[in-house]
């Protein structure tokens, strides 16, 4: 199919190798040498983020793990996250979203009938990761997004298109929402510009540098 063809045409441009990862890890360690943490990682309790937590410790980094509780966490999922991070000796910060606001926003997206139903969660996650990075003076955010697992998808169904578009989220909620979003984490265009170009936040898709396979 055309998505598979596009994947194989672009895979060599995106995927890197462990030798290319080494100088990045060295730079993260050097810049964070006088800080408690040298990078931020997002944890959901899923396979990808759990492996990233294991990998960054194996690489000798000192991460602060950030988890977003959007109201859908189960007790088992929370327990798994806490046990995993305790085993790896990684500190955890959990941001709990106002459930009434988030529920109203999710209902707004359902009523809008757009494909990207996870846009509100993805946006909030990225906003919280950058907020925690700013608070701790950390430049590097290491995540579990990866080309191999996520590229073969109809672009029109991908949350990546709108997950950073606060205007889209705000306008959908303005049309369909019933309560104000007073505390919902957000990344305005200014926030994006400030974190990326002034504070130089850098996202490392670390799984693109290694031979990562869920089957293994």
Where are the predicted features?
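Nucleotide-activated chemistry modules centered on ATP-dependent adenylation/adenylyltransferase
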Residues: 1-38, 54-216
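Short, glycine-rich nucleotide/cofactor-binding loops
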Residues: 39-48
């Amino acid at each position: 199919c055309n998505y598979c063809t596009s994947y194989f045409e672009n895979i060599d441009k995106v995927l890197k190798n462990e030798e290319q990862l080494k100088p990045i890890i060295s730079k993260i360690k050097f810049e964070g040498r006088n800080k408690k943490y040298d990078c931020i990682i997002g944890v959901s309790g899923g396979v990808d983020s759990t492996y990233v937590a294991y990998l960054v410790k194996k690489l000798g980094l000192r991460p602060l793990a950030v988890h977003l509780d959007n109201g859908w966490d189960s007790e088992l999922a929370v327990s798994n996250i806490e046990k995993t991070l305790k085993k790896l000796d990684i500190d955890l910060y959990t941001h709990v979203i106002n459930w009434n606001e988030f529920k109203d926003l999710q209902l707004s997206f359902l009523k809008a009938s757009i494909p990207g139903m996870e846009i509100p969660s993805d946006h909030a996650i990225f906003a919280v990761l950058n907020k925690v990075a700013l608070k701790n003076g950390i430049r590097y955010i290491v995540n579990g997004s990866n080309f191999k697992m996520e590229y073969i998808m109809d672009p029109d169904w991908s949350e990546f298109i709108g997950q950073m578009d606060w205007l889209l989220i705000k306008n959908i909620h303005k049309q369909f929402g019933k309560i104000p979003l007073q505390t919902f984490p957000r990344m305005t265009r200014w926030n994006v510009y400030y974190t990326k170009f002034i504070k130089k936040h850098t996202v490392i898709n670390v799984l693109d540098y290694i031979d990562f396979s869920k089957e293994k």
